[in-house]
A protein has these predicted regions:
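Positively charged n-region of N-terminal signal peptides that target proteins for export
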Residues: 1-4
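Bacterial signal peptide processing site
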Residues: 19-21
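A short, surface-exposed beta-strand/turn
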Residues: 116-119, 201-221
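Short, low-complexity, Pro/Ser/Thr/Gly-rich segments in the mature regions of secreted, periplasmic
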Residues: 218-237
């Protein structure tokens, strides 16, 4: 009888040990729901801007750093207020060329400068600085607006439903998906820098963007969060 009890205890301990090995609370993902945001691209689409920069007023082509290409913005910018027609004005330069003034840039062997075309009071503006964006969109009054503003000024990405992608190797413990929170004074927007440059493995970093109500932003130190193993062998210049 005693021997049977010892054997039973051993089996229970072994089972618990196996379950604890499988359950690692430090690898959990803290999930958040994606906001329902959309951007109306009709203004620039109707002008044909997504096909050619010839849609731009003449003064835009005669100024320094003329726009090379125009792109639709992400629906994540749909929280910006006032709600104005907006599109990305892109310029590509290389390391030996003069940098283009921009709201933000993504830099590798080539540099992609992001400015915005925004229609204010019926007039199209080319906004090429953080101050220009702040002038148009401050004050920041709610969490969706803070999310859109942070994405627009940094180019960082929002990630949701991370657990559904089996190709992601989780590095942060825990990994928290994108959120936007207001503590009564400032907004904190949790985003991800997934810009690819060089050879893999490519690590996606999480960054907290602090947004004040008057439109100032500051960035936390980046934290290695996850990597997509399907891109480990990818090299990008």
């Amino acid at each position: 009888m005693k021997r049977n009890l010892i054997l039973l205890g051993f089996l229970v301990a072994l089972l618990i040990s196996c379950r604890l090995t499988q359950f690692n609370p430090f690898r959990r993902v803290i999930e958040h729901s994606a906001p329902e945001l959309t951007v109306d691209n009709a203004y620039f689409k109707d002008l044909g801007c997504f096909q050619s920069v010839d849609c731009l007023p003449e003064e835009f082509t005669n100024r320094p750093y003329p726009v090379q290409s125009i792109y639709q913005v992400s629906d994540l910018l749909g929280g910006l207020r006032p709600e104005l027609p907006i599109a990305i004005a892109g310029n590509v330069t290389f390391y030996d060329e003069e940098k283009v003034p921009s709201v933000y840039s993504q830099n590798c062997m080539a540099s992609f400068a992001v400015r915005y075309l925004i229609v204010v009071d019926g007039q199209m503006r080319l906004v090429d600085s953080y101050e220009g964006m702040r002038e148009i969109y401050a004050p920041i009054e709610n969490e969706d607006e803070a999310l859109s503003y942070a994405v627009a000024l940094t180019g960082y990405s929002a990630y949701y439903d991370i657990k559904s992608n089996s190709d992601y190797k989780i590095l942060a413990k825990p990994l928290e998906e994108t959120y936007s929170r207001f503590d009564g004074e400032v907004f904190t927007v949790h985003l991800f820098n997934d810009f690819l440059c060089g050879c893999g493995p490519h690590i996606t970093e999480s960054v907290d963007v602090t947004v004040t109500q008057d439109g100032e932003i500051s960035l936390s130190e980046p934290v290695d969060t996850f990597r997509d193993v399907t891109m480990d062998d990818l090299c990008i210049d």
